[in-house]
Amino acid sequence: MAAAAAAGPGAGAGIPGASGGGGAREGARVAALCLLWYALSAGGNVVNKVILSAFPFPVTVSLCHILALCAGLPPLLRAWRVPPAPPVSGPGPSPHPASGPLLPPRFYPRYVLPLAFGKYFASVSAHVSIWKVPVSYAHTVKATMPIWVVLLSRIIMKEKQSTKVYLSLVPIISGVLLATVTELSFDVWGLVSALAATLCFSLQNIFSKKVLRDSRIHHLRLLNILGCHAVFFMIPTWVLVDLSTFLVSSDLAYVSQWPWTLLLLVVSGFCNFAQNVIAFSILNLISPLSYSVANATKRIMVIAVSLIMLRNPVTSTNVLGMMTAILGVFLYNKTKYDANQQARRHLLPVSTSDLSNREHLRSPMEKPHNGALFPQQGDFQYRNILLTDHFQYSRQGHPNSYALSRHDV
């Protein structure tokens, strides 16, 4: 298993069977984390649906999630000794240069604020979709994310995919269409909200990886920064939409349920925070392909648990559409992973002469910018393809430069 390989060379050296025992313990830890991830994700979605069915204020639920992220991440970052974000460079040369690379002067307004707005908008849209349509259908629509990623990568990054990758999108489209036409509790606004959330998550996926690559910020540190900035977008929306409704509404039926509602909101915020941290930890332990399988399994678990707990009316054709879409997501991930591995094999030199030739033919050398090296356009496209599914979260990908990111839960 990939997690066993991540233990590092020399683990258990000189002790017969130590390597196998370490691999078994690593596998057991990954399995336990996956089960906990599934339970938190499924439970959190069921709790969200229960809240929104009796308390139809999706912005309030989103605000609780963002606040839980802002309150819970800083202690973890300190406990795991996650390095702080690099300082922002000034307009001129600094008299006391920093020991490491600096961020561009307009890094926060140009990159962080748009990503924070995307996080806010995606969270609100996702909760509106869960409010309007069943959890099972909302998660089926979220399976269209690979379609959006491929389209947006082609438009924004000029990234072309192989024919196999495009063909792997067909089951996703077919499954979502089948689930939509057979959905008994269909709602147009629920579908639009789910699609908007998925589109926004896809944009975040593309640009977050670009920001992480260029800035070298730790992924959990970036998550904390985006959450704190998203609060500034969330609070005005909450005041205008939900708080104003609380103050002027004559229907006070839900006031008597405030203690129960507040408890559910706390549970929902904790589940969202915990599953975010555990998802990053799992991705840090296993290969991207194994993670994609675990993520597809998690979506199946969420749909199954929601159907059992919430008793949504479904047909066999509706379930077939859901499973087809999820199977399509797995096929897409497998095809994309194989394509990236093939590209990596072409990139690696097989002899010293190959290495010399590639060094000679390399596009103009990276330009130093505030102490950091940034690649020119020549190999940007390949690096972007390689980073799409296998990024800095994986300990196998960057064992040396990201040793500090190997935080296990």
Swiss-Prot record:
Topology of this chain in the membrane: Multi-pass membrane protein
One GO molecular-function entry: antiporter activity
Residue ranges of the TM segments: 50-70, 111-131, 133-153, 165-184, 188-207, 222-242, 252-274, 282-303, 312-332
Gene Ontology BP term (one): transmembrane transport
Any one annotated GO CC term: Golgi apparatus
Subcellular location: Membrane
Keywords attached to this entry: Membrane, Phosphoprotein, Transmembrane, Transmembrane helix, Transport
Modified residues annotated as Phosphoserine in this record: 363
Protein family membership: Belongs to the TPT transporter family. SLC35E subfamily.
UniProt function note: Putative transporter.
Name by which UniProt lists this protein: Solute carrier family 35 member E1
Chain's gene name: Slc35e1
